[in-house]
């Protein structure tokens, strides 16, 4: 039987390429949230990511096309950073930064996380990591991010934050 009166929230998943395995954790957490709390409260959170919610299109810069296709329609975003900041766009230092700024300018919720996990020094791109640190410094007084130590800590914190925000 269809559920009547369900409120659906679109959650943008935004992150550079070094944390793509965290996307699965986010999706699992959202699915668990929907099963546990969503049914009881008539809400559903739907994840959106460029890899599944965009289509080939021409006529503008790639990030602007993504923004038009689905980013601006999202109700909230979750962003995760570790050692890479991402690929620059025409407006910002990375697509992830542009998506965060789009959300903040629209006064929408951004769940932002920075990983504090060790990395093999030979795998570290110092320029990219410096951009992550500068970005974190830029937002340190806005209170919009959390530091996480590993995947378990991230899942625990994100699930808690999801519940606190949507319930």
Report residues per predicted region.
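A general structural detector for well-ordered alpha-helical segments in enzyme core domains, enriched
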Residues: 66, 96-99, 131, 135
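Conserved TIR/SEFIR loop-to-helix hotspot centered on a Trp-containing motif
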Residues: 58-62, 83-105, 124
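Solvent-exposed loop/turn segments at secondary-structure junctions
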Residues: 18, 54, 84-86, 117-120, ...
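A short helix->loop->beta-strand "cap" motif at the edges of active sites that frequently abuts
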Residues: 105-115
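Generic beta-sheet signal
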Residues: 80, 113-115, 148
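Conserved N-terminal substructure of TIR/SEFIR domains
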Residues: 1-80, 106
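Extracytoplasmic/secreted cell-surface and envelope-processing proteins
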Residues: 21, 86-90, 121-123, 156-157
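C-terminal interaction surface of TIR/SEFIR-family domains
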Residues: 2-3, 117-167
């Amino acid at each position: 039987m269809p559920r009547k009166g369900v409120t659906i929230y679109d959650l943008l998943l935004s992150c550079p390429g070094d944390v793509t395995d965290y996307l699965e954790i986010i999706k699992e957490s959202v699915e668990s949230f929907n099963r546990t709390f969503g049914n009881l409260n008539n809400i559903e959170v739907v994840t959106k990511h460029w890899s599944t919610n965009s289509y080939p299109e021409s006529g503008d810069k790639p990030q602007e096309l993504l923004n038009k296709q689905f980013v601006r329609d999202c109700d909230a975003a979750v962003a995760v950073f570790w050692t890479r900041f991402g690929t620059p766009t025409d407006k910002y230092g990375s697509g992830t930064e542009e998506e965060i700024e789009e959300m903040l300018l629209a006064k929408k919720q951004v769940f932002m996380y920075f990983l504090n996990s060790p990395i093999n020094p030979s795998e570290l791109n110092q320029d990219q990591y410096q951009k992550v640190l500068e970005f974190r410094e830029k937002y340190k007084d806005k209170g919009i991010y959390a530091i996480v130590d590993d995947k378990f800590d991230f899942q625990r914190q994100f699930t808690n934050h999801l519940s606190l925000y949507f319930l």
